[in-house]
């Protein structure tokens, strides 16, 4: 590759300067990746390096003679050295009394750090030597340090303060960690001898440069340069949130599976979720979406505007345009924010969408956020961190998506979730991924995320007493305006999370109150399901006199405050319970017709008068 002006990234330039002033350097973040860097051996060219090689690329020009690397289970290795530096490195190994590529115990690693840091107290002169402690967190066994581990860190801390400069640098110790807090705060914080440098995830420009380098290895690449550049651009955009090493793995996967360059998005998807098939792009889904308005309208009654709005958003998801306007195609396939009164079909519509999109109502994962109002409930979703009970089990959300990435994920009553969970939702909406308690990455790029809320229906009034903000006497446009206004107030001002509101604002779908016509149809369907159960279980028919049916419908739809759920509960109380008593006392014979003449109250219960 021949870039015009290859330069080191900012984090590596920071390390270059830190070598002159800090005897110890702590590296965190994206420490396990490949890095696209200038090739020291060929001016004007770049190549991909691992972290240790990248460190040597800046240490050697600074006059360092050798680079040693230690990792748990492997031991210490001499990675690179000049002839003079090799002599110095061998002296370090002798002083520490360790051999290369042999596992070391804690005391030996402590001796190794001591031998490196104090090297110039034992020799007349020579080039500086650096030691890289890869996976430094694995040196420690748990959250609570043992006496030996505390002695190890105390020794490293003391050595940093007594280190002597060697020419333009020190005999440097590099600590390599995924997270800064993997080391105790007393060691890593406020220590002016220790430079902390974070290595960021590759941004779009880095991914684009990498995509251009790697795309030549993709099968069936177009011959036209403009088309090849377009493939590289799509590769870079589709790999949002991925590391360069993962991009290299995507190319290998595409080559092995025979996925052509023009379908690089499919290769990225297969790498992320483990399956090359994409239900979102199936012709069957697009056909179902074209006729879905009627189907969803018969399942979720009385919400034609909400259904239409949802289908508009799903059309964008099915055509792959979600996130296209931002250049970020790693966002979830779609996001819906259902708002409205209770019992009007929000949850039912989410279930219906799972069946519509993926052919299975069970492709649906629901979390009641009232159960996640405590701070520790985060562990239930993404898994407990290392050292805590349940760490090996993982989280309900992350496990569910890992097992089946193509599904509807419903977060019910989002306003009841703990504030820390809102950070996780923001990460899902922005990046389409989460890191679970075990450190693995889970991708939501093929999921439909649905939030529901009752915000804006009842709001705090004077003295914080609840006041109805909307009523069933209002028309839908007024209801929608009032509900949207309160949702904005809630996120922007009451909980101070405007960034979350900005992510869902265009996905808000406001549901209407349940109107009498839809309520009667829900009641009639519920009665029909009861009759079907009698026919299925007893072989008998259930019939009603006109007056009994009218009484039942009137009672069921008298109070619509609790929506369809209230209608079903009323029919359960008025019809199902007394019917169960009747069937238990006098079981019907197959073919018998059971006819309800009247329904009468009896104390707190109801009885059926049978003909």
Regions found by a protein language model. Name each.
Residues 11, 18, 23-26, 164-170, ...:
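AAA+ P-loop NTPase nucleotide-binding core of proteostasis motors
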Residues 1-263, 393, 401, 426-430, ...:
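ATP/nucleotide-binding catalytic cores
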